[in-house]
Amino acid sequence: MLGQSIRRFTTSVVRRSHYEEGPGKNLPFSVENKWRLLLMMTVYFGSGFAAPFFIVRHQLLKK
């Protein structure tokens, strides 16, 4: 009895909730401004690419 009422409650909550739909609405960042998106992606991927080079430089200069 209790399980059925809990199941009915959770399905009604899910049914009543509404999320924005459309391209880019389910992402954790905004895709509205293409230049800001370009800058953020460049920083994100550029830092991952540059990190090994900076680590090697640091190790070579360390003595």
Curated annotation (Swiss-Prot):
One of its GO terms (cellular component) is mitochondrial inner membrane. The keyword Acetylation applies. GO terms for biological process: mitochondrial electron transport, cytochrome c to oxygen. Residues 61-63 are mitochondrial intermembrane. Pathway: Energy metabolism; oxidative phosphorylation. Gene3D superfamilies: Cytochrome c oxidase subunit VIIc (4.10.49.10). Disulfide bonds: none annotated. The modification N6-acetyllysine is found at K25. Residues 17-33 are mitochondrial matrix. Keywords: Acetylation, Membrane, Mitochondrion, Mitochondrion inner membrane, Transit peptide, Transmembrane, Transmembrane helix. The modification N6-succinyllysine is found at K25. It holds the Pfam family COX7C. It is a single-pass membrane protein. The chain crosses the membrane at residues 34-60. Residues 1-16 form a transit peptide. It is found in: Mitochondrion inner membrane. Component of the cytochrome c oxidase, the last enzyme in the mitochondrial electron transport chain which drives oxidative phosphorylation. The respiratory chain contains 3 multisubunit complexes succinate dehydrogenase (complex II, CII), ubiquinol-cytochrome c oxidoreductase (cytochrome b-c1 complex, complex III, CIII) and cytochrome c oxidase (complex IV, CIV), that cooperate to transfer electrons derived from NADH and succinate to molecular oxygen, creating an electrochemical gradient over the inner membrane that drives transmembrane transport and the ATP synthase. Component of the cytochrome c oxidase (complex IV, CIV), a multisubunit enzyme composed of 14 subunits. The complex is composed of a catalytic core of 3 subunits MT-CO1, MT-CO2 and MT-CO3, encoded in the mitochondrial DNA, and 11 supernumerary subunits COX4I, COX5A, COX5B, COX6A, COX6B, COX6C, COX7A, COX7B, COX7C, COX8 and NDUFA4, which are encoded in the nuclear genome. Belongs to the cytochrome c oxidase VIIc family. PANTHER family: CYTOCHROME C OXIDASE SUBUNIT 7C, MITOCHONDRIAL (PTHR13313:SF0), CYTOCHROME C OXIDASE SUBUNIT VIIC (PTHR13313). This is Cytochrome c oxidase subunit 7C, mitochondrial. The gene is Cox7c.
